[in-house]
Each structure stands twice: as structure tokens, then as C-alpha cells.
Amino acid sequence: MADNPDPSSLLPDVFSPATRDWFLRAFKQPTAVQPQTWHVAARSEHALVIAPTGSGKTLAAFLYALDRLFREGGEDTREAHKRKTSRILYISPIKALGTDVQRNLQIPLKGIADERRRRGETEVNLRVGIRTGDTPAQERSKLTRNPPDILITTPESLYLMLTSRARETLRGVETVIIDEVHAVAGSKRGAHLALSLERLDALLHTSAQRIGLSATVRSASDVAAFLGGDRPVTVVNPPAMRHPQIRIVVPVANMDDVSSVASGTGEDSHAGREGSIWPYIETGILDEVLRHRSTIVFTNSRGLAEKLTARLNELYAARLQRSPSIAVDAAHFESTSGATSNRVQSSDVFIARSHHGSVSKEQRAITEQALKSGELRCVVATSSLELGIDMGAVDLVIQVATPLSVASGLQRIGRAGHQVGGVSKGLFFPRTRRDLVDSAVIVECMFAGRLENLTPPHNPLDVLAQQTVAAAAMDALQVDEWYSRVRRAAPWKDLPRRVFDATLDMLSGRYPSGDFSAFRPKLVWNRETGILTARPGAQLLAVTSGGTIPDRGMYSVLLPEGEEKAGSRRVGELDEEMVYESRVNDIITLGATSWRIQQITRDQVIVTPAPGRSARLPFWRGEGNGRPAELGEMIGDFLHLLADGAFFSGTIPPWLAEENTIANIQGLIEEQRNATGIVPGSRHLVLERCRDEIGDWRIILHSPYGRRVHEPWAVAIAGRIHALWGADASVVASDDGIVARIPDTDGKLPDAAIFLFEPEKLLQIVREAVGSSALFAARFRECAARALLMPGRTPGHRTPLWQQRLRASQLLEIAQGYPDFPVILETLRECLQDVYDLPALERLMRRLNGGEIQISDVTTTTPSPFATSLLFGYVAEFMYQSDAPLAERRASVLSLDSELLRNLLGQVDPGELLDPQVIRQVEEELQRLAPGRRAKGEEGLFDLLRELGPMTVEDLAQRHTGSSEEVASYLENLLAVKRIFPAMISGQERLACMDDAARLRDALGVRLPESLPEIYLHRVSYPLRDLFLRYLRAHALVTAEQLAHEFSLGIAIVEEQLQQLREQGLVMNLQQDIWVSDEVFRRLRLRSLQAAREATRPVAATTYARLLLERQGVLPATDGSPALFASTSPGVYEGVDGVMRVIEQLAGVGLPASLWESQILPARVRDYSSEMLDELLATGAVIWSGQKKLGEDDGLVALHLQEYAAESFTPAEADQANRSALQQAIVAVLADGGAWFAQQISQRIRDKIGESVDLSALQEALWALVWQGVITSDIWAPLRALTRSSSNARTSTRRSHRARRGRPVYAQPVSPRVSYNTPNLAGRWSLLQVEPLNDTERMLALAENMLDRYGIISRQAVIAENIPGGFPSMQTLCRSMEDSGRIMRGRFVEGLGGAQFAERLTIDRLRDLATQATQTRHYTPVALSANDPANVWGNLLPWPAHPATLVPTRRAGALVVVSGGKLLLYLAQGGKKMLVWQEKEELLAPEVFHALTTALRREPRLRFTLTEVNDLPVRQTPMFTLLREAGFSSSPQGLDWG
């Protein structure tokens, strides 16, 4: 201890005593980076401070500047201009980081202030303010009027301040701190910031000191140059003492042969995910989360973050049910990423929340605080938590899949142990074996500090143009001075004056042609004076259209004109980046449905359904620009090290030392070597050729150099292939290579020559090709927008993307003729420098041509392991979505190569991927048992034995069309001529064809007859192999036990032989003991694919209509058996519980009060009685609310479950002005609380005003409030009375509205004709008071209710429900639910529009019903009110066409009869007219009319006369007799009812 230095000796003598004493009280000693930073700051030098996270560099940057403010405040030496300006400017690349810094600054500010008070020094209070895009306008105004001493902002907000009056608050800035400077230095955002800093310096009397804070970077000099521009910058980069603990975790021994998830886990959600690595990854992550106090799990995409969050919560909930003792101590939150269970389970605890850019900032803040406080154990995030946000004491970071870069990996792992002296602990969970190799290299680079080089954009002219307009909008610019200032910023230090002038020419309207006249100039350039001034509107344009983040558009995906039928054409959206990679006839996937691109327009993608087709690879392009070439070379070097065995013979790094990790790496290398002979690497590329399913060649170049190298290379290759073979090569580039498809050719096979180019020629090809590419067009629009050449019509409002594209295309069309136009130059630079890495490609090509790097070519029968990963990298993402509907999973997987199936899926469940009915059909066909497949004649019998193998006489007869006598005669002849012979096999006497004699002898030891010809006795090379293959090719699916029994062999011999056949590629192992011949599987697959694609086609509207009848409890799921007439409703539910379920499903639906008890409830509850509803109302379990008055005796009424009323009830708006005095008095009485009888209400009003209340007026006022949704009664009796009242009764209650002069309306004498016992006033009345939900909760509840009610959320359903915000708002919510895995999007029902959302089980049930419809014709007809939500016709779907003049409508009193979903009959309101839909010359069954009369009998008082059916007098129609038999009676006018 005596050797430890005195902490005060480590503190530089640059601070005031108060600051020094505070620091020594607060900390044991400064960190390594802090004293060095303070020395540099004290010398007023610019500094780049490089240190890992948790090293105290933020305090190092601030403390000297803070101390100076305290000293000057105490000495009262501040200059006047400084009193109204900020002194310290902190710039953060992310808003949340600024919030953290504001909070953390309070510690030194308060500590130093307290220390000054203790020392008796002058009190100084320094203020901190934040100005970002989230700062309200009022707060921004306050900051401008009264600037804080320390201002925290973002690059974009700094730009806006410099381009407004707020810049005056920056004139006294002395210190600028740029945090996470490495995060912006390599982008246009950083270039934009660099020029903003130069504009800031132009405001100041003395240039501000710049201090940049950075995590570890590879080239400190590059970042320092970016920070300082032409100013010298001192780099503070002490040796990093932090040694992270990193380990790669592989939970299985073979990632490409994952056995089924162990049973007994209690997790139903694993069903259908056999063979997937994901259940093991999820379980492993949950185990680690439970072992640590706080964990951040990083993923590389938002969709994966949402799904992984949901899976972790489901697993945790399942574990908690089995073992309550594992419950974490922390509090739990309601999930905001979408519930993982149904509503009754929504209150379950959960352990993880998601955090990414699509989560609202409020929810992100809640998540961050919960993790910091220990209330939340786990956050699953994307790069949103990668930078320096203070997340508290995080114990562990888990990275799923390889991080996007080495720097990203360091940043993410650095989130753990973030505090000073902490140790970062991280785990990597790779998803594939190739992912494992990449992760190993990333981790090695992290330990070695080999980070990627930053490549700042060079002379970005679009950013220069924008900043020039912004600067000129505030002050007239002297052009030479502005040029000098621009060149002080590092990105433009080499900017040629000619290019600078061309940019000013563009901004000032000096275009090279009159074609540009539509694009107005922004500036005025006086050539004589050299002064640049802004045109009117330039400042507003600069602040409303500024920034560098591209407005990457979304293309609307639509059905062709006329294909929408009754629904919407809109299918969804595609990102612009995806569209530029797409072509006509590509297959894309949106939600659960596949679509073929028919046309790509300026802002739309027109598609047609392509059921079950796999989507094209580019639509699964990952985030980021791809792997840097340098990192790719390191991965290639590592592969060579693995291939030559040197790695395994040396000391294996601890992070790779786990047994599973080593086994998977070794397995991958060995399998790749066996497949291609050479393991691809950095010095030896491999060209692999193999045929695809239809016989075309797939050309796969294995190269590790990354997408930025491969994409431009692919451009040239595509052109060469097109020139050689005259076809679209469909060339696709990825980080691991290039894939091309070439048509089958009899000529020379493609070899390595198609990949070799002269370097200069290759670069020329790429440069020429890129200018006409869709990539160039998309980037041109972004560059033009940054250069402010495409402002919106209304400043401050976003221009629709289609308009942006139109203007950009017009500008591009003009500018393409002028290669020196600045935006053309910038777009070329961006494509060739930022998107592509042409220098790396040129180096690679020179090394290939010089022989330093070799290319070997090989032909394989099936893709090698590396090729499998390259071809189907997107499949892992797709297969993780195991909750896709069954038909889509079958169809998409079945589109893959048969030989790749086992590697992609592991242990495949054939019952899921192969149609069971297809399996049965193919088995019968192969065994010659199917009709039309049986043998005929003598030769047919011989063919049976030759094709199927030895059989008994009985088996042969079963497969022959002849009689048993004929079969016996044929066999006798065959035996006589020695074409067949008898043999004992497996204890049975069978007949075999002579060609099998030696085979049976050598394989099975069968004793042969002595008289066999010698020619049949020669030894066979592979006798057992031949027998097995024939048996497998004659059956659909086979088990080892079947083979063992068939040939009387031991199971070990059978399994060994099967494994050999598998290695030879002749058979496939679909499960542990299910085998299939390759040829048979191809047949099964094609037939199953056809069946699956049929299943993925939208079902008929009648199928959906049938689903709704089943879903809403009108008919049982078993409906479809022969229909039998029943005199009662076929409702599914019974008793009070049944009524409760109906109300739950129809909660909030407004229906005529007259229908609830006459049609709606009886149609679903077979034993319904009014006492059931009264009981629920009396107990308070159910409440009702009025919505709208319908005439004098009816109105729309909704029912609600009391417990969930907030989800279905919309509170009435307080409309005091339109309420009568009596209505206001009633509301005032009920507002005191409780429920009151009408007489009590009257009495309380009289007590208040001292006068009696006219009971008729009271009744009228109460019902007016009912229809306003303000009050309700605790019984249904008032509604019954209302709907049953006759016109006479209504007349008796009418009264004169003439009031006595001078007396209020509620003070009239009591009418003797109305009493308090009137049923219309029965029950206790109360206010409808429901605690409202916020908009998000309300919309989610509406969506869940609609899914329960209708099964599918469609535009029509939203219109029917009158949802606030309409379908666009509901569609936004549904997309979020889709992202979290709750629902799927697709085109499931014909005529329901392109955008439909449903749960997976609903989709599967729809298709089950569609299949049954082809097999069953007998359905129970059921009559419903036309208004019934279970009736889709005229609501969710249009009424079927009918030639009659009567137009059906959904009106109270109208009835429909539906059978199997098909609309058969419509009875109009009033009963006078009827429509009947029937097939030609075919009468409706009597049961249809019995169903109608069953519904009519529910309304005993109903009376009407039916006169017309289909525009004909009813007496002249065949329906006359059927209706009489059903219960109508004849009358002169037609048919009477009642």
C-alpha cells in the first residue's frame, strides 16, 4: 500500500482548489486518459481522446472547461458577449446520449459548487440545456432567450442553429466536445458536421477548442484530421488496460445436423421447428440472462430483435409455470413489442424488452431506465444501444450472429462493465457454421485491435452545396473566403477550385443548358465583387430540407388494375433499395404471400400472386455496406489456416476452445474439402459449378472479399455472361462470393475465365455500367435532395416520394448529358467510392492475373457447404419465422433443391413439408395399387417382379387386373420358361425374376434352385445396395425397420447401408428413421409443391363466409355432414357462459336493439332466454351503451364486458351546449355517483329546484342521453319495451312540447298517462364512466377484437367497424404486430383486398375449410339477420350478383340464409320481397326455407305478406310450395307469415 502513489500527485496542477478537492473526494484517482487530456486542454490544443468505453473520457473532456467557467464566474471576468451565449458545446451523434450526459454532468456541477461554498468562494451556478429534434418549440425559444452555459446538441441541430437567429447564442463558445466522433467521421453526416464546425468558427472571435472523444480506432491520424481539419490535433491515446472476456458459444455439436428439440420442455412453440438451431440459441440466451443481473442482447435487424424478444418471454413464462422458484426479483412490465399470448395471458410476466429505431422514444426511455434500475433483466437491441448511452451496470452482452464490423463488436461488448475499471463480458452466438468462422475472426480482431479503416467521403459536393446555401442565407459570402473556409474542413481539403466554382454555378443558376430552367437558383453570385448572396426563401429551404440522412423511399406494391375486385389493390411496400435490385418476373415475399413482379413504375411495383414461390435472394439483403475487403482477407487467411491444420495443432484461443466450437469448425472445413477438394480462402478462390432443379448451371465463386468488392465485379460478370450465353445471368453478390445462373449448354462449361478481367478494363466496364443502373438513379435522387435541388412545394412539408422521383428523373435526364454537372459527379463518386470498393477490386484483379491468388474450378452434384450458405443465407431468417402458415412453409421450402433440404432444415418433418395425401397417393402409384397403375397380362406380371422385387402370389394378384386364375396361368408360363423362380425370403415363399438370382444369393444368402441357367449366377458388384435402392424407389417413405423386416437383416446392417447410400447422394434421411429415395422425393416434392401452391391461393369468399359462421359460434366446426332439418337454431353455445362468450366477441359492435334478443344471441346460444342477459347485467359483468337512435322504437346498442369495457367503449364527448336543461340536470344528479331509479332521479332533481318533473319529459331526456352514449341502465327491460312498443303505445306517450311561460321544461305537471312503472324507465340508471385507454392501447385492443370477431383484418372490416383513422392507422398497427410475429400479412381471401392480416391458425383453418369444400357438399343452412356480424355479405364482401331489381341491404328486419358460406336467400325488410340464389334448373333444399322460418319464429309478433320472389309473384315460383311446407300460409296476395 505504501508504494501506491498519492492520488493528488496524479492530478495535474491546472485546476482551481475547489475542483481539485471535489475530484479527490469523489474518485480514488484519475484514469490513465484523464491527466493527459487535462494537460492538452490547459494548453488550449485541439485533442482527440481515444479510450475504451468506461474509461472516464467524457469527464476528461469536460472538467477543465467546467473548471474555467467556475473560476471566471467567481472572478466576475466574463465578457458581456459571453453572458448571453453558451460557453461549452457538446455534440452527440445520438439524442439519447446527450440526455445521459446532461444527467451525468449534474454530479461535477453540484459537487464543485458545493465545494466552493464550503471554501467560502463566490457561488456560481452553471446551467445545462439540451437542444435536439425532440426539443419542443417553446423550450427552444427559452434556450435562445436565455442560453445555458453548457449546450448539448446533435450535428443536425447545430446546423439548424447556425442557420437561424439561434446562432447568436453560440458566439461565445470556447470549447466544442464531439462525442463518438468515430461514428460520424466516415460518413456524409460527418462531412456535414465538419463544415458546420467551420461555420461555427466563423462566428467566434477566437476559434473554439475542439475535443473529440472516440472509442478505439485503427487510424487515429485520420480521425484527428477529420476533427481538426487544417488545425493540429493532439492525440491522447494511452494504452488500453481493459481486457474483455469474450467467448463464442455453440450450443450443439453439429450446427448443420441439429436433432429435434428434446421433448418434455413444456414448450408447444417448438412444434414445427425441428432441425433448427434457434431453439437452442434461445434457450442458451435465456440461461445466461437468468445467471446475470442485467444483459443486453444485440441483433443485426429489428425484425429479429422483435421475434427474439417474444421467444425469450415465451420461454421464460413457460419455465415460470413449471418452476415458480426461478422468478426474477425485478419488477415486470407489460410488453410493448406485442403480446406473445392471447388476451387472457397478456398479464404474464416477461423478462425482455426490445429496443430499436422503430420503438418510440418514450418506450425506449422506459426500457433504458428499467435496465439501469435493475427492474428489467434483459434488453434485445440493434445498434440503437451500441453507442455510449449509459445503461447502468450491465453484466453481460450477448451478440447474436456476427456483428457488422470489428468496431461494432467492440462497441457492443463495451456496453458490459461500462463503469471505470469494469471488465466487459460478452458472448457470441453464431447462427451457422460459416457464421462461426466469421465470428472467430471478428473476436480475434477485437483482441488484437485490428479495426476497419475509416473512409471519409472525399469532396462530397451535395453536402457542400447545402452548407453553402445555409451559410449564404445568413450572411453574404465572399467566395474566396468561403472557398478557403471550406478547404479547412478535412473532407474538402483537396477540393479543386474548378469543382467548387461549378457547384456555385449550379446553385446560382448558371446551368450548362437551358434544359435546367425548371430548377430555380438558390443563390446570387456577383462575379465582379465575388460576393455570394441568398435568394428569398433560401434560409427556409436550408432549414426545412437540410441534413444528410437519405429519404429512402417506399414503393407501393399493388395488384394490377381490375384485380382488386371488392377489395383494395394495395398489398404493401418495398424499400427503394430492394426495388433497384429487382426486375420484372422476380418473386418477392410480403408477409405470408409470394408475388411476381409484373411492372415497376416510378413509385409502384405491380404484382400478381405467385403462391408458394420462393423470393429472390436480394430481398433478404442485410444491413450496412457489406464486409470491408480487409476484413474479408483476414477471414480468408483464417480459412487457409484452418484448412492446412496449423490452427488445430497450435494453441487454440480460449474464446474458441469449447468442444462444440472446435467440432463445428472442423466439420465445416472437412466437408468443404470433401466437396470441392480445396477450401476457399484469401489466396485461393474456388469456382463451383452445379446444376439446379431444372438443369441450368449455377456458378458459385467462393471469395471472402466482401460485397463492396463483389458487387462491381458482378456487374461486369453479368455483362460477360449475357454476351456469351445471351441470357440474363441473375448475378447476385454477397459478402462470401458471387452466384450466377447460366442456361444449360452443350458447349464449354463456364470456367474461371469468365471471372478474370484486365484491371483497367474491369474498372472501365463498371464505370460505364453504373451510370445507367438503377443504383445510380436512386443515389442521384438522394444527392440532388441533399444539394437542395428538389425542395418541396410547401416548405416544412415532406414532398411525396413519387414527386421526388419524378423531379429527380427529370433532372437526371437533363444532367446526364453534362458529365461535369456537380450532382452527376457526386453520384458517381458515391457509387464508385462509398458503395463499391474499386481500389480493392483492382488490387484483387491484379493479384489474380499475376498468379498471387488462384482460382480453381470444380463441378459438384450438389452445392458444397459454403455454397449452401451462400445460396440460401436468407433461409435461416425465413425458417426462424416458424409461425408462418403451414402452406407457405411447405411451398417456400419445397422450392429449394432437394439435395440441400437436409442441410438447410436438419431433421425435417415430412408430415409438415410433404402433403400426407400426396404421400399416400404416390405410395399407391409406386406399388402399382392405384387405379390405372395395375399390371395387365403376362408381361405385366414379370414387370411387377422386376420393378418391385420378389413378391408372393397374393401380392402379385392384388396388383394385376386379371382374375386369380389368369394370374396363376401367367405365372405358370413364366416359371416354365425360367424367367422367374421361387425363393424363400424372410420366411415367405416368393417369386422373383431371374435377373435377381445372384443378387438375392449374394446379399441375403437365398438358396437358389439348382436348375438355374449359369448366366444368372455371376457375382453382382453391389447386391444389397441394389435391393435397397429398388425397395426405396418403390415406396414413398421407408424406415430402417421396414427394410430389416423385408430382407431379414439386422438393423445395424440396414443402417450402415442406408448411410452409404446417403453419402452417395442416392437417398435422403428426412428424420432419424424416415428415408426416401432421391427420385421419389423429387416426385413427392413436386406433387406436394403443387398441392401447397394450391393451398396458398386465396380461398373463395364462401370459404371465408363459412369461417365466420364457425368463428362466431353460429355453426359448429363439424358442419358439413349431411344436413338434417332441426327446429331449433344450430347455435354452438349454451347458457349464461355462452352469452358471455358472444358478448366478449361482439363487444362494442353497435346493432339494433331489436336484433340482440330476437336474432343475434339466439343464433349463437341454442338455449337462449332473456333471463341470461338480465343476469349478466344485474351482476355487473356486462354493460350496454346506446350509440344511435333509429326511428321511434329502435336504436343501435352495443354490449361490453365490464372488465374490458375500456377496450370496446368510446366515451361520449361532453356536449353541454346541445343538451337540454333537464338532460344537464340528470347528468348532474348521476355525476354524484351510484345508480338511481327514474323516480329517485326525479326526486333528486325536484329537491334541487323545488319543482316537480314531467315524467314524459324525464323519459324523453333519459333516452336522449342513452343515444348520446352518456347513461345506461342495469337491466335490458327498457330496450325490450322500446322495441316492442306499438304505434298506439307510442302515440299515448306523446305530449305537447309547449311549456308554460316562464317555467323550465322540466317543471311541467306530471302526466297521468305515464308512471314510474313504465318499462321504458325500468332499472337503475347511471353514467357510463369507463377509464379511457390511450390511442395506442385503444388501437391494439380494437385490432385484437377484430381478429377475434372476423379472423381477418381487412380494409372492409375496418370500414365496417368505423375505426378512428381508418384503414391506414390500423394497417400501421398491424405491421407492428406482424413484425413481432403476432399476425401474418397476405392475400388469403378472394375479393377482400390485397392487404389482409390474420393469425396463423386462422389461415390454416381457412385452408382446411377450402379443402373440405372440395370433398363435402352437405352443409347446414342457417338464417341470420342481414345485420349480423357473422354475415359477410354486403359488409366485408359485396352481395353476390343477382338479375332481379331488388337490391339487398343490411337493414334491421332483413334476413339471409347461408349454407356452407354460400348466400342462398335474402328476405327484405318488411317481408314483402325475397331473393333466391340457385343453380340453373335446381331448386333449393327444403331445409333452406325451414332455416328461414326458424329465424322468423324468434319474433312472435312478426306479421307480413310475401308477394315477390326474384321479381316474380310468389305464387308463380317453385318456392311457393316449399315456403308453405316450411310454415307460411297462403293468402290472395301471396304468402302470409304470423
UniProtKB/Swiss-Prot annotation:
CDD domains reported in the protein's UniProt record: DEXHc_LHR-like, SF2_C_LHR
Effect on the protein upon substituting residue 1536 to A: Loss of uracil glycosylase activity, no change in helicase activity or DNA-binding
Catalysed reaction, written as an equation: Couples ATP hydrolysis with the unwinding of duplex DNA by translocating in the 3'-5' direction; ATP + H2O = ADP + phosphate + H(+); Hydrolyzes single-stranded DNA or mismatched double-stranded DNA and polynucleotides, releasing free uracil
Annotated site residue numbers, Wedges between bases of the loading strand: 549
Single GO MF annotation: DNA binding
Region (Domain 4): 624-897
Keywords: ATP-binding, DNA damage, DNA repair, DNA-binding, Helicase, Hydrolase, Isomerase, Nucleotide-binding
Impact reported for residue 620 to A: Wild-type ATPase activity, unable to perform strand displacement on a biotinylated substrate, decreased helicase activity on an RNA:DNA hybrid
Motif segment (DEVH box): 179-182
InterPro entries: AAA+_ATPase (IPR003593), ATP-dep_Helicase (IPR052511), DEAD/DEAH_assoc (IPR013701), DEAD/DEAH_box_helicase_dom (IPR011545), Helicase_ATP-bd (IPR014001), Helicase_C-like (IPR001650), Lhr_WH_dom (IPR045628), P-loop_NTPase (IPR027417)
Region (Lhr-CTD): 898-1538
Annotated segments matching region Disordered: 1287-1312
Function per UniProt: A 3'-5' helicase probably involved in DNA repair. Translocates in an ATP-dependent manner 3'-to-5' on single-stranded (ss)DNA, unwinding any encountered duplex nucleic acid. An RNA:DNA hybrid with a 3'-ssDNA loading strand is a 4.5-fold better helicase substrate than 3'-tailed double-stranded (ds)DNA; substrates where the helicase loads on a 3'-ssRNA tail (DNA:RNA and RNA:RNA) are not unwound. Unlike its M.smegmatis counterpart, the ATPase is not ssDNA-dependent. Forms a clamp around the ssDNA loading strand.
Comment, domains: The Lhr-Core is composed of 2 helicase domains, a winged-helix (WH) domain, and Lhr-specific domain 4. It is followed by the C-terminal domain (CTD). The Lhr-Core has ATPase activity but does not oligomerize. The C-terminal domain (CTD) has uracil-DNA glycosylase activity but requires the Lhr-Core for maximal activity. The purified Lhr-Core binds DNA, while Lhr-CTD does not.
Family: Belongs to the Lhr helicase family.
Protein name: Lhr helicase/uracil glycosylase
